């Protein structure tokens, strides 16, 4: 069985275009994640509030971050992408975030094969209200769990690509090939 985190390439055009593994489709209240040991999708929890995910949400394979998880990615598309869908995603920015005091950046990307969004090259091209929606969702979705999330800022594609490269490098150091 292929493990979505360890056995799938981050993509041969990274950091500009990466592979993303979707865990949660846009519009869902269920928080799914790939089980680190078994590589299958598990229900982490149903969101405590009436919020729903504003974008397709997942991770970049063979990436690793300080929170001991793969690097998160939000993939914008005109369609809801099913959990465990592999999607080529053009990196356009990053939302810098602290979750309970721990760094938890979210890469913002567009589906490379979706003509309704693949012309977007940088987060600055998104409608300002969309980034406000993302900020609001991530600041508020854990409040009823008594957890604190702080959105520091949104940054451009250049910084986002550096964060992608750093996470791929950390993965290689943390999980050396046998």
Swiss-Prot record:
One of its GO terms (biological process) is phosphate-containing compound metabolic process. Mg(2+) 2 binds at residue 72. It is found in: Cytoplasm. The keyword Transport does not apply. GO terms for molecular function: inorganic diphosphate phosphatase activity; magnesium ion binding. The keyword ATP-binding does not apply. It comes from the Bacteria. GO terms for cellular component: cytoplasm. Substrate binds at residues 31, 45, 57, 141. Mg(2+) 1 binds at residues 67, 72, 104. SUPFAM superfamilies: Inorganic pyrophosphatase. Its cofactor is Mg(2+). Keywords: Cytoplasm, Hydrolase, Magnesium, Metal-binding. CDD domains: pyrophosphatase. Catalyzes the hydrolysis of inorganic pyrophosphate (PPi) forming two phosphate ions. HAMAP family: Inorganic_PPase (MF_00209). This is Inorganic pyrophosphatase. The gene is ppa.
């Amino acid at each position: 069985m292929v493990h979505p985190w360890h056995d799938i390439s981050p993509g041969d055009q990274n950091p500009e275009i990466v592979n993303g593994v979707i865990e949660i489709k846009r519009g869902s209240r269920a928080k799914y994640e790939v089980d680190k040991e078994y590589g299958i999708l598990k229900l982490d929890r149903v969101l405590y509030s009436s919020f729903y995910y504003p974008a397709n949400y997942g991770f970049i394979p063979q990436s690793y971050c300080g929170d001991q998880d793969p690097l998160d990615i939000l993939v914008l598309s005109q369609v809801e992408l099913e959990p465990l869908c592999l999607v080529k995603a053009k990196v356009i920015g990053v939302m810098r975030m602290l979750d309970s005091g721990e760094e938890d950046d979210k890469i913002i990307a567009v589906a490379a094969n979706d003509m309704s969004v693949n012309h977007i090259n940088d987060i600055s091209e998104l409608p300002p209200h969309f980034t406000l929606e993302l900020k609001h969702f991530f600041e508020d979705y854990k409040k009823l769990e008594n957890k604190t999330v702080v959105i520091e800022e949104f940054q451009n594609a250049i910084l986002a690509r550096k964060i992608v490269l750093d996470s791929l490098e950390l993965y290689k150091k943390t999980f050396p090939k046998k």
